[in-house]
């Protein structure tokens, strides 16, 4: 009989136990792994609102524009205030402000008259016309005051016979030209013209003296009235003005550049002192027009073209005749 090795049996039993234990462990692993693999995923924690959302492939509609609030008005007298918008609309006009003055586009302008004989020009007063000055003893311009419209087209208007204006150069025909100053010349002119145009006995009253300034040229004026001895005559009035510069002492100085205005009136048709002053101050020297420019020098005639060279013509000597002795 074969004797069984007791160690072999013990080994087989130990091996069998190990095999059974291994199989049991494998079954436990097999059951646990599928359970863990097939379980639902753990829910993700909530996403904070500040986190950026994942980009979307679809184009999202644009968000409505946020209205921009207008900037607050700058405080008055602020040293660091920003300048206003140059393109901003101007503020509305004050409804209570007075309207600007309206200037008539067709307002008549004063008529300016040249007087070549006296070498001056002046502005014609409103309501006056230029008359024929050929019969004047002194002066070179005569003005008359109109009293109405012309009776017929093309005819002169009616004029007053108790007032007139005389203008001219203060030349040697008048004693007043010898006075060195304009104030003395105006007073002397008024005295002489008063006696010439109002040769009636009376007394001078209401005498005045006025300074003149014609665009920087000084002058002076004198005014007085005459109370005639005849009570039937209205008081006479005379306004005389002298303006310009007296003659210089230089030997090569030209004629004196002084002109005068004599405005005659009466109590019935008084002198307009303001208009007389404006008339005297409107006097300007009449500047002669500049001479015509000299004609341009004629262009020199072109030089004649050089003549072609001409070959000299050979000359044949003339035979000489010998006379017998």
Curated annotation (Swiss-Prot):
Keywords: Glycoprotein, Repeat, Secreted, Signal
Endpoints of the signal sequence: 1-39
InterPro entries tied to this protein: FAP
Region (3 X 4 AA approximate repeats of [DA]-P-N-A): 85-107
UniProt keyword Isomerase, yes or no: no
Entry superkingdom: Bacteria
Main location: secreted
Ranges annotated as biased composition (Pro residues): 61-74, 88-103, 287-305
GO CC annotations on file: cell surface; extracellular region
GO molecular function, one term: extracellular matrix binding
Sequence repeat boundaries on the chain: 85-88, 94-97, 104-107
Residues covered by region (Disordered): 38-110, 286-325
Glycosylation sites noted in the Swiss-Prot or TrEMBL record: 49, 57, 66, 316
Bias (Low complexity): 49-60, 75-87, 306-325
Post-translational modification: Glycosylated. Runs as 45 and 47 kDa protein, the nature of the difference between the 2 forms is not known.
Subcellular location: Secreted; Cell surface
Summary of subunit composition and partner proteins: Binds to human PSP-A (SFTPA1) via its glycosylated moiety; binding disappears after treatment with alpha-mannosidase.
Entry function: Might function as an adhesin for host (human) cells. Cell surface Apa binds to human PSP-A (SFTPA1) via its glycosylated sites where it might down-regulate the immune response; PSP-A probably binds other bacterial proteins as well.
Record family assignment: Belongs to the Apa family.
Protein name per the record: Alanine and proline-rich secreted protein Apa
Species whose genome carries this gene: Mycobacterium bovis (strain BCG / Pasteur 1173P2)
Classification lineage: Bacteria, Bacillati, Actinomycetota, Actinomycetes, Mycobacteriales
Gene: apa
